[in-house]
Amino acid sequence: MKGYFVSFEGPDGAGKSTVLKEVLAEIAPQLKTQYLVTREPGGSKIAEKIRDIILDPANDKMDPKTEALLYAAARSQHVEEIIKPAINEGKVVFSDRFVDSSLAYQGQGRDLGIAKVKQINDFATDKLDPDLTFFLDIAPEIGLSRIKKLRPAQEDRLEQEDIAFHQKVYEGFLKVIKMYPDRFVVINATQPIDQVVKQVVTELKQRLPKTILENN
């Protein structure tokens, strides 16, 4: 049995990691198969080392093309070592970010072009797309203010970019959503977290195959 691939996307501070944790606490007992939780950049030993390079605030001279290629390199390793084997084993994979983030951050935010960054990532992933993507929708300024409150002085290199960059990234996400309307589910992330989690769980119960989830 082939597995299923779910990704979570959104601007910085949208609450993806927290929402994913809460969603799994509710839905995991109902899954008929094993599941895997992972993240990007990272998810494997090599990819996590590349993550450290990408997000280190000391690397403030990083060229946009270098950044895009490092993300793609980390993703290639992540896909081959972790994601593809899990899907082939019939597992449900839940990933905190995937290719869509590169299209928004590097394609739109860094002005490299969404089409060009997609081409790089098609090569890196053998054109692997999630079956379902949740976009946690929040205005960039609200997301960034959340980060400053929750972990002041711990912003990574991309989180430290100015609001104009993050606004471009947000616009990039909106473009990507229009490219893949059947795959994306947009959730208002300014709601209380229990409401966000409830909506995500409802969508999962409607969309996951009956071979994977009970009571859907």
From Swiss-Prot:
EC number assigned by the record: 2.7.4.9
Domain of life (superkingdom): Bacteria
GO BP terms in the entry: dTDP biosynthetic process; dTTP biosynthetic process; dUDP biosynthetic process
Claim: Kinase is one of the keywords in the record: yes
GO cellular component: cytosol
Keyword annotations from UniProtKB, A to Z: ATP-binding, Kinase, Nucleotide biosynthesis, Nucleotide-binding, Transferase
Alphabetical list of InterPro entries matching this protein: P-loop_NTPase, Thymidylate_kin-like_dom, Thymidylate_kinase
Enzyme class: transferase
UniProt-annotated binding residues for ATP: G10, P11, D12, G13, A14, G15, K16, S17
UniProt keyword annotation of Kinase present: yes
GO molecular function, one term: ATP binding
Pfam families: Thymidylate_kin (PF02223)
Catalytic activity: dTMP + ATP = dTDP + ADP
Function: Phosphorylation of dTMP to form dTDP in both de novo and salvage pathways of dTTP synthesis.
Family: Belongs to the thymidylate kinase family.
Protein name: Thymidylate kinase
Biological source species: Lactobacillus acidophilus (strain ATCC 700396 / NCK56 / N2 / NCFM)
Gene symbol of the encoding locus: tmk
